[in-house]
Amino acid sequence: MTNLRKSHPLVKIINHSFIDLPAPSNISAWWNFGSLLGICLIIQILTGLFLAMHYTSDTLTAFSSVAHICRDVNFGWLIRNIHANGASMFFMCLFLHVGRGLYYGSYLFKETWNIGVILLLTVMATAFVGYVLPWGQMSFWGATVITNLLSAIPYIGTTLVEWIWGGFSVDKATLTRFFAFHFILPFIILALVIVHLLFLHETGSNNPTGINPDSDKIPFHPYYTIKDILGLILMILLLLTLALFSPDVLGDPDNFTPANPLNTPPHIKPEWYFLFAYAILRSIPNKLGGVLALLASILVLLAIPLLHTSNQRSLMFRPISQTLFWLLTANLLILTWIGGQPVEQPFIIIGQMASISYFTIIIILMPLAGMLENYMLQPKYP
């Protein structure tokens, strides 16, 4: 009799994905973030489900219902704090996961990479509509400002914005539909994650060297299950530290004030994980140009496999490209800082310089560095 996990139609799929999966023997802790993202998604869906049981998507009661969850529901404060800070953990893991893909050339698995970029966009959309739900000042004005950007689309822009709003301003209809979107999108993300893994398991994982690892594979279980559990413990520790000791440190104080359409907050800014894109949006003094730059800042990831010029896959043995990669990382941190600053000098010019460098490094300098490194590695005979 064959082992059940190898013969049962359902268990067999799990076995080939998480137990007997051949994995490269040398993948580092940077490969932990995929499983951490899976755990983050499960945490967000479960805490979100319990929050949705008590939340009301009506402009008059939304803010009060969130207060009610925190005050009157058993462990409601904990569920809410884990959900709010879980989003931050999700994005921390996402950015590190994408960074790993860029550094080690994982983007050459084109289908996996493209599904990953679609996943990133979907998670960003989910976080945006979710941020509107507590109906605080920053929720309301964030929704107003960001949805208003669509009015920059020629001819159909204004109609499109009013269609999304369900009226002539962000109001009850907007809140209700955003709640509906926020509920359905995580399940769409779940489906996309399965497709992401499906394509990944067609090729197998990349590894730090970027060399074909087929000659040296080990089973996923027990080696990488144990390794993933270590990463999981550390992430849960960080998440609980955030949620229990300083749950509001990453939020905006303005969101403790109920939404008021007649009073604009002094500085409208999104959550920290959108600040880099917000800085790029603001660095262009033209509405349509800003929107296009905002889109390009994420969609440029789709072009990265086409911009790969090096004969080597990974950056592990490419010091010039490595330097550019860390410059890009520093640049993104500068953009994140600028996104949270008021629109005045010197922040305007710093933001514009950082936005230009962001696109220059990715589109021009990285491909050139790859070509230069190829040339430098060519044997030179006397």
Swiss-Prot record:
InterPro entries: Cyt_b/b6_C, Cyt_b/b6_C_sf, Cyt_b/b6_N, Cytb/b6-like_sf, Cytochrome_b, Cytochrome_b_C_euk/bac, Cytochrome_b_N_euk/bac, Di-haem_cyt_TM
GO biological process, one term: mitochondrial electron transport, ubiquinol to cytochrome c
Binding locations of heme b b562: 83, 182
Segments passing through the bilayer: 33-53, 77-98, 113-133, 178-198, 226-246, 288-308, 320-340, 347-367
Alphabetized UniProt keyword annotations: Electron transport, Heme, Iron, Membrane, Metal-binding, Mitochondrion, Mitochondrion inner membrane, Respiratory chain, Transmembrane, Transmembrane helix, Transport, Ubiquinone
Matching CDD domains: cytochrome_b_C (cd00290), Cytochrome_b_N (cd00284)
UniProt xrefs under SUPFAM superfamilies: a domain/subunit of cytochrome bc1 complex (Ubiquinol-cytochrome c reductase) (SSF81648), Transmembrane di-heme cytochromes (SSF81342)
Note: Heme 1 (or BL or b562) is low-potential and absorbs at about 562 nm, and heme 2 (or BH or b566) is high-potential and absorbs at about 566 nm.
Subunit architecture: The cytochrome bc1 complex contains 11 subunits: 3 respiratory subunits (MT-CYB, CYC1 and UQCRFS1), 2 core proteins (UQCRC1 and UQCRC2) and 6 low-molecular weight proteins (UQCRH/QCR6, UQCRB/QCR7, UQCRQ/QCR8, UQCR10/QCR9, UQCR11/QCR10 and a cleavage product of UQCRFS1). This cytochrome bc1 complex then forms a dimer.
Name the record gives this protein: Cytochrome b
